[in-house]
Amino acid sequence: MQGQTTTVSFDGREIRLTTGRYAPQAGGSVLIECGDTAVLVTATQSPGREGADFLPLICDYEERLYAAGRIPGSFMRREGRPPERATLISRLIDRPLRPLFPSWMRDDIQVVATCLSLDERVPSDVLAVTASSMATLLAEIPFYGPMAAVRVGLLGDDFVLNPSFREIERGDLDLVVAGTPDGVVMIEAGANQLSEQDVIEAVDFGYEAVTELIKAQQSILKESGIDHKKPDEQEIDETLPNYLDKNGRKPIGELLKKFELTKKERDLKLEEIKTNLGEKIDSLKEDNAVKKAISSNPKLLTTSFKSLTKKLMREQIIKDGKRVDGRALDEVRKIEAAAGILPKRVHGSGLFQRGLTQVLSTATLGTPSDAQEMDDLNPSSDKTYIHHYNFPPYSVGETRPMRTPGRREVGHGALAERALIPVLPPKESFPYVLRVVSEVLSSNGSTSMGSVCGSTIALLDAGVPLKAPVSGAAMGLIKEGKEIRILTDIQGIEDFLGDMDFKVAGTEKGITALQMDMKVTGLEVKTIADAINQAKPARTHILEKMNETIDKPRETLSPHAPRLLSFRIDPELIGTVIGPGGRTIKGITERTNTKIDIEDGGIVTIASHDGVAAEEAQKIIEGLTRKVHEGEIFTGSITRIIPIGAFVEILPGKEGMIHISQLSEARVEKVEDVVKVGDEVTVRVREIDNRGRINLTLRGVSQNNNDMNYPQPTPTPVAPLN
């Protein structure tokens, strides 16, 4: 089991890549290690399915809880469905890999990354991305690599390479950059309202580090005796493409200049042109080369027609600076927005439409117990802001089975979630758990950025005090040789024909999220900088349109939203509030009809649809946790009587005992001779014994309510109590 280990010194750390030792039957395998984090990545190729017209690439990231020394909490004590984090890392591996395979590749390719050990100082995702390239190269699959990825953080004014989990949480930037020798091929980022210039500098900083990991992979290939060359482009029979260009260029070109057509009208006209060309080919002689090509592969006409349409659209953008809907390259489609369109049973709602893309977002306010428990390897706490994205088939005029959310839906939801997190109010002042759901009602490009805009509207409509509203735009790019055109607010057909999909979200102050995917093997940082800068006026324009609809949070919450009171108690007294077996807190919730959550730090949150009930529960808890001192005077009710004395509730939930000898200056034979259950009495704290029991006395205390010392704490509501 001997293998080859290569060590790369990287920003003060060592990255170890071991090849030739693990998974010997896989096409290629590498164990990548840094600190105590270890990820095994394999790449395997097998013959593709006959007639496939796409690249069947599968990337899977697998988490094993033993990697963090944990046993799964499921009934079977075995890992089940991949958690969201694993799905997102699978996408993170797929996105920079996919554009690096040749366009003719149709073989099945599977990349599997398994996290075997996790060090909290070294996140596993970027290691898995880099190792996926190395495994693919070792498998000798046709591939335009090497490719590598790094993470860039920002602590204060300093960029940090591959920060720890804790540094990511503390910092203002979480940026993943993947690149090849040709340039940057993928970006994924969350930022705390950073300027465009800061983000551009971070991308440049990250790409410099990427080049070092690329050199390490090239060195390993050389030591392994693998002579890696860029894949050769397969020769394509140009008979049919040439025929379509000759007979279809004019009608397609004329159609693409009819800017007044709707998407549906244009699609129907294109289908009509394709049908006419097909009929023309059918009329050719049987021995005609074009007809033979179609007969051997019926899908060839559709594929070649799409390629010609794509080619002509790109030419029109490069030469004329005009898009299929007549917009200028930097022009945003028509914006419409509405807030509060659903009944207030829904706590907040927003409708956002840009061109034919329409998204309905809803916001729901929940209690701390509604937080999402994260059963994965991420050491971060439970999620208190959740965004779910749904993409039904009717949104693109199609029919298909409705199943559980796929990777794309999970990824788009995570991007919209990331865009809003920097502007959410702090938990101390607004302790609600928030869930936003974005329903894509119609899709024609950039539904994820539509979800960002719709989410902002819905949250403001729900009364959530956002630090600033967030908008987003998707940027595209056409690259023909040295000619480059950047497109603002791309629609679906431009996503199909273009070379880049670059989503930028942020506030008026700065960027909160980025996501860039490529169809080419890399872009210079300068081109990426141009796209980021061109996105700013688009974001600002969209934000202005949104602000015309709603520019600040509603002053009152929905009457159907829970009301919360939040206050802090001594953490050492949490057990007192909970009581043996939870009896005390259960009694409070039943008595007041409230829901109570207590965090380890002593923060108590009370949820109720009745503000008065919440205040009553707060009084009881503060009474239980309030320290009582000798000599204090309280007025309370007799709760029970025993032969040697009577118990008085001096504070909500807190009792003291009056010994029979302390009921009167005179001798008392029976407790009932002086007091009975329900009597209101004024007592003084005589002593607190070493077991914390409160001993009271009536002796020398005037039975006058003016003498009472009963604190009335002022509630600290974090949301209006209506």
Swiss-Prot record:
Residues 701-722 are annotated as: Disordered. One of its GO terms (molecular function) is magnesium ion binding. CDD domains: KH-I_PNPase, RNase_PH_PNPase_1, RNase_PH_PNPase_2. It comes from the Bacteria. Residues 701-711 have a biased composition (Polar residues). Its main location: cytoplasm. Pfam families: KH_1, PNPase, RNase_PH, RNase_PH_C, S1. GO terms for biological process: mRNA catabolic process; RNA processing. Keywords: Cytoplasm, Magnesium, Metal-binding, Nucleotidyltransferase, RNA-binding, Transferase. It is found in: Cytoplasm. Residues 712-722 have a biased composition (Pro residues). Its cofactor is Mg(2+). It catalyses: RNA(n+1) + phosphate = RNA(n) + a ribonucleoside 5'-diphosphate. HAMAP family: PNPase (MF_01595). Involved in mRNA degradation. Catalyzes the phosphorolysis of single-stranded polyribonucleotides processively in the 3'- to 5'-direction. This is Polyribonucleotide nucleotidyltransferase. The gene is pnp.
